[in-house]
Amino acid sequence: MKFACRAITRGRAEGEALVTKEYISFLGGIDKETGIVKEDCEIKGESVAGRILVFPGGKGSTVGSYVLLNLRKNGVAPKAIINKKTETIIAVGAAMAEIPLVEVRDEKFFEAVKTGDRVVVNADEGYVELIE
């Protein structure tokens, strides 16, 4: 299934989805050295490394942008990020770390996507796709 998206940062990625319905704070919420989610939420203990991170949006400190950059430098960044509504902190961090970042407004996408699903993010062509 394909869904339209709005590119915040450019690029293309394919990988396994890591999905939460909760907002994420990168500062304190994700370990910048390991990519493990530390925040008390449904994906606590999971690694964002090499996955398509799907969550409604960010929360928290402006330092979160630098956490995303450090995740990239440490080789544990997500391949791409999908939000419902992207805040500036996530956008700046994704741009600095060269991580494709898109917004999907279609609620059907968020109802359908589950952790472990194969997802293609194509910010350049404006779509995300759930691979069956």
Swiss-Prot record:
GO molecular function: hydro-lyase activity
GO BP of this protein: isopentenyl diphosphate biosynthetic process, mevalonate pathway
Recorded superkingdom: Archaea
EC number from the UniProt entry: 4.2.1.182
SUPFAM superfamilies xrefs: LeuD/IlvD-like
InterPro entries: PMDh-S-like (IPR012016), PMDh-S-like_dom (IPR002840), PMDh_S (IPR020794)
Pathway annotation from the record: Isoprenoid biosynthesis; isopentenyl diphosphate biosynthesis via mevalonate pathway
A Pfam family hit: AcnX_swivel_put
Catalytic residues (UniProt): S61 (proton acceptor)
Keywords of the record: Isoprene biosynthesis, Lyase
Catalyzed chemical reaction(s): (R)-5-phosphomevalonate = (2E)-3-methyl-5-phosphooxypent-2-enoate + H2O
Description of how the protein assembles with itself and partners: Heterodimer composed of a large subunit (PMDh-L) and a small subunit (PMDh-S).
Record function comment: Component of a hydro-lyase that catalyzes the dehydration of mevalonate 5-phosphate (MVA5P) to form trans-anhydromevalonate 5-phosphate (tAHMP). Involved in the archaeal mevalonate (MVA) pathway, which provides fundamental precursors for isoprenoid biosynthesis, such as isopentenyl diphosphate (IPP) and dimethylallyl diphosphate (DMAPP).
Family, similarity comment: Belongs to the AcnX type II small subunit family.
Protein's name according to its UniProt entry: Phosphomevalonate dehydratase small subunit
